[in-house]
Structures are given as C-alpha cells and as structure tokens.
A protein has these predicted regions:
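Glycine-rich nucleotide cofactor-binding loops and adjacent beta-alpha elements
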Residues: 1-235, 412
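Conserved glycine-rich Rossmann-like NAD(P)H-binding loop of the short-chain dehydrogenase/reductase
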Residues: 76-90, 263-278
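Active-site helix of classical SDR
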Residues: 164-168, 352, 388-391, 396
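Alpha-helical segment proximal to the catalytic Tyr-Lys
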Residues: 177-178, 357, 401-402, 462
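Short, small/polar-rich loop/turn modules that mediate ligand/substrate recognition or access, typified
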Residues: 181-184, 212-215, 364, 404, ...
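Short C-terminal tail/terminal secondary-structure segment
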Residues: 214-238, 377, 465-479
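Residue(s) in the substrate-gating loop at a strand-loop-helix junction
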Residues: 372
Length: 479
C-alpha cells in the first residue's frame, strides 16, 4: 500500500528512526495489510488468515471458549493458555489444535490476545482482566490484536453483572490507547444466540484486514439470517455487489476488495466519471453503470442494469457516493446545504426503499452505508456534511429492525482521516493533525474502509446489524 505520509516513511528509515528516538518523537509503525485484487500473492493469501499466535484467557466459566476453540482451529490459529486458564489446552486439543501454556519468560511473541469476559458478574471479578493483560501485554508482537468478549449489558442477569459488563467498554478503549507498535484492541459483545456466529468477526479482527480499526465496540446479536457453510476462499463467490461512487478513492477500494473476495461488482458513478468507472469495472471483471444516484430515475436505471447482470437479485449494496460543500453555516447557500443532504443520505434512502419494494434485494442481503467521524464528532464548516453523515447512522439504526424481518442486515462504517486525493489537497498543518490525532499515529488507507465493509458484507455476518464501526485508528475526535 502506498502512502503520501512522508513522516511515516522517514520515522521508519534508518536515519529517521534514530533521530525520532533521540528527540522523543512519535514513531508510527507501518501497518500490516492484506494484498489487494491483482497484487502479487493476492489469490493465494488474501482469503486465508496469517495464523497469529494467540494467548487465550477468560473469567469464570467463560462460555465462549468452546466456540473460540473450534473457530481458531478452523482459521488455523495456534494458541497458548494463560496460567489462570489452563483448561483451554484441553479445549484446543479437543477441537484439533495443539496448545500449551504461555510463559513470558520464554520470549514468545504472541500476535493476538483473546479474553472471554462474558461471565464476569461483578466489578470485583474485573480483576481477572488486570491479571491476564498485566501478564501478557509486554510480550506482544508488532501489529498485534487484542479482543475482549463480553455479554451485552442489557442481557446480564443482575444489575451487578450489567454494571461489570459495561465497564469493559472503558477498559478496552483505554487499553487501545496504551498499545504500541501498531497493535489494536476491540470489545465484542456477544449475545448467547450469536455464540455460533463468530467466524467472520474473528476472521476480520485477527488479521491484517482490521489494520486501522481500534478501540471499537461491536455487538453480535441474534443472527438475522443463517450462516452458510464456511467458505473463506472467495466468500462472496456467486454474489453481486453494487458500490456507488466507485470510480476512485474509497469507492474504488471497496469495489476492489469485494471483487477480490469473489463478488461481481456493479461499479456506479456519475456520467462525468464514466471513463474512470469503466476502467475500474473492467479491471475487476465487474460491470460499470453511469448513473447519478440523486436523479429521480436512479433506482429504475439500477434495477434495469441488475436485471441483466444479476437476474437472481442483489446481495450487497454499498452506499459510498458522497460530496462535501464546506462552508460555515452563515456563508452556506441553500443549494450547498440541500445537495449534500440529498446525495449523501436522501439518495441512499430512496434506493433502499425502491430496491426493497421491487424485490431486487435478495434474502440475506447486506447493506452498508459510509458515514464519517464528522457525523459523530461534528466539524467546523461542515454542518451540512456532518448532518448527512449522522443521518446515515440514523438510517442504519432505523432500518435494522425492519430489514431483520426480511432476513437482511444493514450497518455503517465511519471513516476518520483516510489518505485520498481529497485529503492530499488539505493544508499541511491540518493534514498532519488529522494523521497524528489517533492511537495509531497515522492516516488510514482506502483499503482499510474497504476491508471493514467486506467484513460487514460477509455471508457469515448475520449477527451484525444496526452497527456503526469507526475506521479511524481510534481517533481522538468523537465518542
């Protein structure tokens, strides 16, 4: 992955690293990422997880451990047991994976830490978190992963248990800010009905796919559709995806990753970008569609195209197209206000409704919207844009229960500072602040947004709906 971040490159050069250390300057670590469509080894390795040596722990009866043992075996992930959880060795062996005891004195460098905190029923029992991570953090390898599993607080049996489960959020967000060398941490609340639906989430978070996601909280609920048979090599094979705004930047990256994972991608963009979007579609073996999504006949044009390329219906719909018209509110014209709201959130709502009414969206369809940190934290000069992106989040939350009745899911990603042509044109001081004001000390890449969308669009992600996942390196802005 190329980057225009000169400081990142300098700080990791032979001379730059010495100078940064001498002056006490930050040294952001180049993040490990998956190969993209058409890159060397993409077909061989983009679909298979690099097995990260994982240390496993848990509190109480740790009800997720049996499922975790099976999933880690399926993913080919080797594991070690923390001293307080030696029963893990037998569980791993029973699942078909060799395991042993973690001993930090042996100099082992685990790539991941997993802790099942879902049985913690009081704040006193949170001490088990301290013990596990106090013993293991110093041994972590670079670009490591930390996953804490909990029980959704509203499902806890007692007020004391609910209180303790809610504490996990503050713990994980703080821990993510303490991690170094490109490591990340997440909290995954798992409802009892979702315990057998961890596959796509583990596949994502234990791999380089989740390079720029950290400090996030996701909830796996009662799945809205059944998990199909496991197929990690090209999991989207035989499926059709529509990506709007696909001619360049984040949209092109989304189309590229979905194509890498096997989807036929319909690349949609405005007529003036016809040449660019056609080039993207041709490269990916997809199909281009020139269409202004805000036009009154946009849904009809899209349905007509899908009737030809995907007569069985649409599996994945990604609302990526969007615009900015930045002005302070006092200087903003009504046209600048209205165009941003209409394209960024009005058009996606109309497309959703029209495709549902026409029966174009298949059962098990996944819809993903692209929101923004601006929609969460707000941003000066972006009242229109922030309102539209907050509305995307509202759209996801409002549509989730309605789509669940049809066995479909809807989620959103909220990117932070992503290295694109647009951010490259931002003034230097603002650009540098955007890059450094997160726990990973660097901007993200379009592929980071794309990989997160591919996780939410995975056929085995039926337990994820109504979720908003930030792709921001744990930005200091927003909640």
């Amino acid at each position: 992955v190329t980057t225009s971040d000169r400081y990142l490159a300098f700080a990791n050069s032979a001379v730059g690293s010495k100078l940064a250390n001498a002056l006490g300057l930050p040294r952001p670590v180049p993040l490990e990422r998956m190969p993209a469509y058409g890159e060397p080894d993409a077909d061989a390795s983009a679909h298979a997880i690099s097995p990260p040596l994982t240390v496993v722990g848990g509190a109480g009866d740790a009800p997720l451990l049996p499922t975790l043992a099976r999933e880690l075996h399926w993913l080919g992930v080797p594991s070690l047991a923390h001293a307080d959880r030696l029963d893990w060795i037998a569980r791993a062996n029973q699942a078909g994976t060799m395991s042993g005891r973690f001993n930090p004195a042996e100099g082992v460098r685990p790539k991941a830490l997993i802790f099942d905190a879902s049985a913690i029923a009081s704040t006193d029992e949170l001490t088990s978190l301290y013990t596990f991570f106090h013993d293991t953090l110093a041994s972590l390898d670079r670009c490591a992963r930390v996953l804490v599993f909990g029980l959704p607080p509203h499902l806890a049996a007692t007020p004391q248990a609910s209180t303790a489960q809610r504490a996990l959020e503050g713990f994980v967000r703080s821990l993510a800010k303490e991690l170094k060398r490109g490591a990340t941490a997440q909290l995954l609340y798992v409802a009892p009905a979702a315990r057998e639906s961890l596959h796509s989430t583990l596949r994502f978070f234990l791999s380089p796919r989740a390079a720029y996601v950290s400090g996030q909280v996701a909830t796996l609920q009662d799945p809205v559709f059944d998990t199909p048979p496991m197929r990690d090599q090209r999991p989207l094979s035989g499926q059709t995806a529509v990506v709007t705004g696909a001619a360049r930047g984040i949209g092109e990256a989304i189309a590229t990753v979905l194509a890498r994972d096997g989807a036929h991608v319909v690349c949609v963009d405005i007529p003036s970008a016809q040449e660019a979007v056609s080039a993207v579609a041709t490269k990916l073996g997809g199909s281009p569609l020139s269409c202004d999504i805000a036009a009154p006949d946009a849904a009809a044009i899209l349905r007509a195209h899908l009737a030809v390329v995907a007569p069985a219906g649409l599996d994945i719909l990604v609302h990526n197209a969007g615009i900015t018209r930045d002005k302070t509110l006092a200087r903003m014209s009504e046209a600048q206000w209205q165009s941003v709201l209409d394209i960024n959130v009005g058009a996606p709502q109309r497309l959703n409704a029209a495709l549902l009414e026409a029966g174009t969206l298949r059962e098990r369809a996944r819809i993903v919207g692209v929101a923004s940190i601006s929609g969460i934290a707000g941003n000066r000069g972006q009242t229109n844009y922030a309102a539209s992106k907050a509305a995307v989040i509202g759209m996801v939350e409002a549509w989730a229960p309605l789509l669940a009745e049809r066995h479909m899911s809807i989620n959103a990603v909220a990117p932070g500072f992503i290295e694109t042509q647009m951010t490259a044109a931002v003034p230097f001081a603002i650009r540098e602040a955007g890059r450094r004001m997160n726990s990973l000390g660097q901007g993200g890449q379009p592929v980071d947004v794309a990989e997160t969308i591919a996780w939410l669009a995975h056929p085995a992600s039926g337990a994820l709906t109504g979720q908003v996942v930030r792709v921001c390196g744990q930005s200091l802005l927003g909640a």
